[in-house]
Every structure is written in structure tokens, then in C-alpha cells.
């Protein structure tokens, strides 16, 4: 019985370690707004929220209609008026204040000189992008995007 419990405990610890190493890879390449015309810079200082960006259409998110959003350095897209909590990343469980928020890569990100936070509206979508953002205490950069489609879906 003790051997069975020990084996189960080791298997659980191994499983947790494997899960903590998970990397998400999207099904498509980045649209990459960095060299496109008509792109709006939403660069914000470290741990700050950008100015408001108009989506160019009404986006229904959990029963509420939105026409604008703002992004934060730490990988947050928020649809309400301030979204100030998006600027303060903590690894704690998410509270109810994160309603009407997408967290595509919620971590402590640093915007260096080569980094950019951009947005652009197209006829069928709006793209918010974080490019070459460095994680706190890490050397490598991350680039990711959120796409809001006019049919009220996102990826």
C-alpha cells in the first residue's frame, strides 16, 4: 500500500512539472503590425495601460457591446473605461474585477527600446499586438496578438 501511495505521489509531481512547462503555439502566424501602414502605437510605460483604441465596429463580449479597448504592458486587453488593474501583474488567482478582459499572455512584461504595442483595424477584424516584449528576469522576447473579429469571436 505504501509503495502504491509513493508511486502515485511521484506521478503527480511529475505531471505537475510537465504541465508547468507547457508552451502554447498558435495555429497561424502573427499578422505582425510592426511594418504595416495605418497602425496605431499604443506603447505604454512599464506596468501601465495604453490610451483607448477605437475598434472600428461593435464587439459583443459576454453580452455587452464595446467599441473600444485598451491594452496593458503586462499582456492584458480590457474593454471597460480604465482597466487600471491590468497594469499590476500578480500571479494570484484572478478576481472578479477582470470581467470584460482578455489575458492573452498575462505575466510581468517589460517594454524595452525595441518593443512595441500596436493596434490596427481592418474591414473584418481589429488586431492588438505586443511585439518583442521581454518577461521580467528573462532574456528572451515574446510577440503575441489578439484578433477581435467583427462576428464577435476572438483568437
Where are the model-predicted features located?
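Short, linear, compositionally biased motifs with a strong N-terminal bias
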Residues: 11-12
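Positively charged n-region of N-terminal signal peptides that target proteins for export
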Residues: 1-5
Amino acid at each position: 500500500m505504501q509503495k502504491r501511495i509513493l508511486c502515485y505521489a511521484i506521478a503527480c509531481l511529475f505531471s505537475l512539472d510537465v504541465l508547468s512547462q507547457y508552451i502554447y503555439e498558435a495555429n497561424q502566424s502573427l499578422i505582425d503590425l510592426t511594418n504595416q501602414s495605418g497602425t496605431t502605437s499604443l506603447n505604454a510605460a512599464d506596468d501601465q495601460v495604453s490610451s483607448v483604441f477605437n475598434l472600428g465596429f461593435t464587439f459583443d463580449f459576454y453580452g455587452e457591446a464595446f467599441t473600444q479597448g485598451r491594452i496593458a504592458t503586462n499582456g492584458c486587453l480590457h474593454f471597460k473605461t480604465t482597466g487600471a488593474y491590468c497594469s499590476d501583474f500578480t500571479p494570484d488567482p484572478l478576481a472578479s474585477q477582470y470581467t470584460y478582459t482578455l489575458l492573452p499572455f498575462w505575466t510581468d512584461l517589460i517594454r524595452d527600446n525595441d518593443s512595441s504595442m500596436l493596434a490596427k483595424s481592418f474591414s473584418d477584424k481589429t488586431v492588438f499586438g505586443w511585439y518583442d516584449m521581454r518577461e521580467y528576469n528573462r532574456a528572451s522576447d515574446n510577440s503575441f496578438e489578439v484578433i477581435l473579429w467583427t462576428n464577435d469571436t476572438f483568437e
